[in-house]
UniProtKB/Swiss-Prot annotation:
Region entry Interaction with the nucleocapsid (N-RNA), spans: 479-568
Region feature L protein binding, mapped onto this chain: 412-445
Renumbered residue ranges of the record's region Disordered: 1-24, 45-324, 434-455
Family per record: Belongs to the respirovirus P protein family.
Region spans: N0 binding: 33-41
Residue ranges, annotated region (Multimerization): 344-411
Family annotation (InterPro entries): Paramyxo_PProtein_C, PProtein_oligomer_dom1, RNA_pol_Pprot-P_XD_paramyxovir
GO biological process: one example: viral genome replication
Species the sequence originates in: Human parainfluenza 1 virus (strain C39) (HPIV-1)
Assembly and oligomerization: Homotetramer. Interacts (via multimerization domain) with polymerase L; this interaction forms the polymerase complex. Interacts (via N-terminus) with N0; this interaction allows P to chaperon N0 before encapsidation and form the N-P complex. Interacts (via C-terminus) with N-RNA template; this interaction positions the polymerase on the template.
Protein name, per record: Phosphoprotein
Amino acid sequence: MDQDAFFFERDPEAEGEAPRKQESLSGVIGLLDVVLSYKPTEIGEDRSWLHGIIDNPEENKPSCKADDNNKDRAISTPTQDHRSGEESGISRRTSESKTETHARLLDQQSIHRASRRGTSPNPLPENMGNERNTRIDEDSPNERRHQRSVLTDEDRKMAEDSNKREEDQVEGFPEEIRRSTPLSDDGESRTNNNGRSMETSSTHSTRITDVIINPSPELEDAVLQRNKRRPTIIRRNQTRSERTQNSELHKSTSENSSNLEDHNTKTSPKGLPPKNEESAATPKNNHNHRKTKYTMNNANNNTKSPPTPEHDTTANEEETSNTSVDEMAKLLVSLGVMKSQHEFELSRSASHVFAKRMLKSANYKEMTFNLCGMLISVEKSLENKVEENRTLLKQIQEEINSSRDLHKRFSEYQKEQNSLMMANLSTLHIITDRGGKTGDPSDTTRSPSVFTKGKDNKVKKTRFDPSMEALGGQEFKPDLIREDELRDDIKNPVLEENNNDLQASNASRLIPSTEKHTLHSLKLVIENSPLSRVEKKAYIKSLYKCRTNQEVKNVMELFEEDIDSLTN
């Protein structure tokens, strides 16, 4: 490209306004965009139009009118160039070659638009789609209803459609099939489609047409199968043989689908796609194969086959197994192992479960398997019970040892208590008995003489004096005068020997009778003692009961001990 297109002569009239006006870059950028969009062979034919100077809008009114005729597909580059020429301080010159160059530009722009729309009269713009650096692309079928008016919106939507079309080609299906729109075969739709039928869509680029050359019939079946509606009715009541047959069919269909995948990858003409396309293609292919497998399996399940003798045999086996389980439960209930038949059916212990399975098993292999499981579970349960019994025995032994220790401690404590009780009893025996027996007269040991001490006031000691008889007290009166109360009660033969006459005189005391006078004197001594009144009466009674002098002596010794204890 010549550099003369960028240099312009200045008008001498506009030299005064030059510092205020500047050359706009938008016109230059528009020219560059138009020039670079064509092949260098087309530009090299006639380049004289590049030397033309941008003129006034007054001289280029026919070009604006020519653009108004194409409002549907308006491209604003020539008009923008003329506007930028107005704003800048470009020199205004007139020449005849300007209209010719502008008309040539309009013709080339119409060719460019026709190649974009896919309806060109000559085959040259159709081959322009094979160039990788151009942005010519097919319109998406979603935009057929809306007429385009601006070039920028068209380019942006074409860029989005190119990304979607790359996803379609990675998946292996053409764009029209992916959006599940019906394909039209009549010629009217092809002519009225603005060049967007299947014939023109196959010329995106060499990279995309290589993938869509030979679509296999398996892929077409998979697409049709995927667009079908999923069946929702599934048989619930299936026997065991039907389930096994369905599982085998599922395995066979999965193997066939994997073989079809391998066949399709091997029969592709130009080998495997790049790694990025593989990584993007794997989840979609897996999803499609999952759908096909599910629909094929549901179709196989929904087809009701007539009852075969195999189904009858399995039903008979199930009936016999149920009857055998019921008989087993009745036997266990009758033997007393289980409480009720319902309990055996609902029990979750391992041995019971294996027993029920063994009774329901169809062949010897299952029976031996369940029998082995039952034996192992029984052995395990017995081991658990043995371990429980061992732990219980250990606990019982520990409790016995602890009870022995407690018994030993309690016996020792009991011995200590017994010894203490015996010591207390011995002390009480010494205190109470004083070591003597009262019934045996020959025994010289001391008789019991424990008396309870009252709270009587202590009487002062008074020595006996014969002058006391002259006092007014009854105690100190002589025998002849005072009333002898005790003499009537005491029946002592010693005292009654010479006491025949009751009205004796005072001279009777002078009769020599040792026993009588000694007892009387002892009585006086006891009465004049500082002891309490009850103790005095007790000593006097014991003194009158004495038969021998030794007994009298013992009584007087006890009396002296009591007086010593009081005085000390």
